[in-house]
């Protein structure tokens, strides 16, 4: 099978490791444009809590798929895949390199693997039965059920990714064929994945400092303004940094406790992000916090990859 003609670079990793800065640098060095791959930066009026890149930080580099949805509207991976695919085509047709930057792994993998989305949902009874079994027996047991029925699929799906484990089990029941034997769509793009990480203690310190900076920059006021028009149970308001402040604004919690929760949830999320990218995406890892000079090695890596046929 020939490789897809259009090539894209993805910059992935946990929160607070410098993905946005690297995206700008690569775009400047490689005639690129940045496409957002963060599930919450697509929302308007959610700037501080999502660490959305500012116009000044863009340094003139075009950025796409930021501020494209109202916070009252639910967004989905299917909508993202459609919008991102169209934007990649537009950028590539301009002879520019599409550079996707973000930490929402499933959004990015939907593009990398050309995952089929928006199809017919499995019957509720099957899904509920496996969800009950998961709640009763745990994720290790659930994954073992998949491993017994479809070892190839189990090798590709982490036990912690219970949603996809259940999906694989459902498909097997629905079709009578193993999930791994289902016809897979051909990738639309050839993809190089660059991952950023750093020492865990350093990462957690950076996360804590970032949350403090967000609070000083006016995150509380941003959340308060959103709540004037956006329900607290809206999808957008489930973002870390937003949902934790709602109880304080409703007079139900102390501010210091809410901020501590933002830090805790952000650290836990960073750990989950790293687990996902390590298990689900073939990634070239770099630590630009400890070795900022390695950004030039990343440029060289991308240049060599672009020359491959």
UniProtKB/Swiss-Prot annotation:
This is tRNA dimethylallyltransferase. NCBIfam families: miaA. Its cofactor is Mg(2+). It comes from Lacticaseibacillus paracasei (strain ATCC 334 / BCRC 17002 / CCUG 31169 / CIP 107868 / KCTC 3260 / NRRL B-441) (Lactobacillus paracasei). Its EC number is 2.5.1.75. HAMAP family: IPP_trans (MF_00185). It catalyses: adenosine(37) in tRNA + dimethylallyl diphosphate = N(6)-dimethylallyladenosine(37) in tRNA + diphosphate. One of its GO terms (molecular function) is ATP binding. InterPro entries: Dimethylallyltransferase, IPT, P-loop_NTPase. Belongs to the IPP transferase family. Keywords: ATP-binding, Magnesium, Nucleotide-binding, Transferase, tRNA processing. The record marks 104, 127 as: Interaction with substrate tRNA. Catalyzes the transfer of a dimethylallyl group onto the adenine at position 37 in tRNAs that read codons beginning with uridine, leading to the formation of N6-(dimethylallyl)adenosine (i(6)A). Pfam families: IPPT. One of its GO terms (biological process) is tRNA modification. It is an enzyme of class 2 (transferase). Monomer. Substrate binds at residues 15-20. The gene is miaA. ATP binds at residues 13-20.
């Amino acid at each position: 099978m020939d490789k897809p003609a259009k090539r894209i670079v993805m910059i992935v990793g946990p929160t607070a490791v410098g993905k946005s800065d690297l995206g700008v640098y690569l775009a400047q060095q490689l005639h690129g444009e940045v496409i957002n791959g963060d599930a919450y930066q697509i929302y308007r009026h959610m700037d501080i809590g999502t660490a959305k890149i500012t116009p000044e930080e863009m340094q003139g580099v075009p950025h796409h798929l930021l501020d494209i949805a109202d916070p009252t509207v639910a967004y989905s991976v299917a909508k993202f895949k459609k919008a991102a695919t169209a934007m990649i085509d537009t950028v590539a047709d301009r002879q520019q390199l599409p550079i996707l930057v973000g930490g929402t792994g499933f959004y990015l993998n939907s593009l990398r693997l050309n995952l089929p989305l928006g199809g017919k949902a499995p019957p509720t009874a099957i899904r509920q039965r496996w969800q009950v079994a998961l709640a009763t027996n745990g994720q290790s047991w659930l994954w073992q059920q998949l491993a017994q029925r479809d070892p190839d699929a189990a090798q590709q799906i982490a036990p912690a990714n219970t949603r996809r484990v259940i999906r694989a089990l459902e498909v097997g029941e629905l079709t009578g064929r193993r999930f791994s034997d289902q016809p897979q769509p051909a990738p639309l793009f050839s993809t190089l994945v660059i991952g950023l990480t750093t020492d865990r203690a350093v990462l957690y310190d950076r996360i804590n400092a970032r949350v403090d900076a967000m609070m000083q920059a006016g995150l509380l006021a941003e959340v308060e303004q959103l709540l004037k028009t956006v329900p607290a149970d809206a999808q957008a308001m489930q973002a870390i940094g937003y949902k934790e402040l709602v109880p304080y604004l409703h007079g139900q919690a102390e501010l210091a406790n809410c901020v501590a929760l933002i830090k805790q949830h952000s650290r836990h999320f960073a750990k989950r992000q790293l687990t996902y990218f390590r298990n689900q995406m073939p990634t070239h890892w770099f630590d630009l916090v400890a070795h900022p000079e390695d950004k030039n090695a990343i440029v060289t890596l991308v240049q060599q990859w672009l020359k491959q046929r």
